[in-house]
Every structure is written in structure tokens, then in C-alpha cells.
Amino acid sequence: MEWRYFVVIALICPLIIVETLAVSDCVRHVSESARNTVCDVRQYRVTKGVEADRYVQCFMTALGFADESGSIQRSNVLTALDAVETHDGVYTDAVDVCLSKAKKLPGTERSGSFFSCMLRTESAQNFRDAVELQELRVASKWPEGERFDRSKVQLMMRELNSQLRC
């Protein structure tokens, strides 16, 4: 009977670790040689390659925008966009187009494809805002009930990027 508890704990513990992953952890797990790639992604420069895909997958998962297999979590992305956009639903078409493109790719490339696609849409600024606000929320640096304030978010992100050497 005791071995069953061990199996359950062994299966649940990795899930708990994945859920508590922060974006800063994704940066720390990247090799020093890939630091410029990470910084390019954090500055919303479209960057391709294995290191970029790996980092984007990690931070999209940390934000709750993707699952571990690379599948985009549409409802989470839309909820984050709702938090920064006053015109409800303007960005839904962009999310759906990018989601459709990403679904056709292997799991390791989906998050990067979706991220890059969103940066090429009319909703690019809203997507950036949503990513940044969500990163601050996940890091417990933004009170959950506080309304979005672009200038405050941008200031906090500059400080965070500076700490991450980006």
C-alpha cells in the first residue's frame, strides 16, 4: 500500500514544480552563450532557432499561455489580453489565426510560432502588454486586482530586464 503513495507523490511533484516556474527561472536555465537570444526575445525582436524556441516555450508555459507540450492555451491568452485591452474581443481574430498556424507545427515550435505571429498582427502592442502584465502577476510583482497601467508596467519591466541583464 505504501508504494502506491510513493508513486502518486512521484507523479504529482513534477507537476507542482512546473506550475511554480517563473519566467526568471527560464532565463536562468539558458546558457550564457544564448543570453543575447533571450534578451532579443524579451525585447520582442523576432528571433528564430532552437534556443529561442526553448526559451519562448518555457516562458509561455510559466505565464500559463502554453502547456508543457507546446499547445497554446487560448482562453488564458484571451484572458490576459482582456486585462490590457478596453475594446473587448478586438484581438480574438489575431489569436485564432496565430493559433491555427502554430497547431500545424511540432510541439517544440508551437509557442515560438504563436509568439512571433502575434508580434506581426495589429494586436502586437496588446499582446506585448498582456505578456508583460502576466509576467509581473506570475512573479507576484503586480497586485491581482490592480488595473493595467502601461507606463507602470513598462517601468517595472525595464527594471526586471535590467536585473536579468537584458
Swiss-Prot record:
Its main location: secreted. It is found in: Secreted. Disulfide bonds join 26-58, 39-166, 98-117. GO terms for molecular function: odorant binding. GO terms for biological process: sensory perception of smell. Transmembrane segments: none annotated. InterPro entries: PBP/GOBP, PBP_GOBP_sf. Gene3D superfamilies: Pheromone/general odorant binding protein domain. This is Short form salivary protein D7R5. The gene is D7r5.
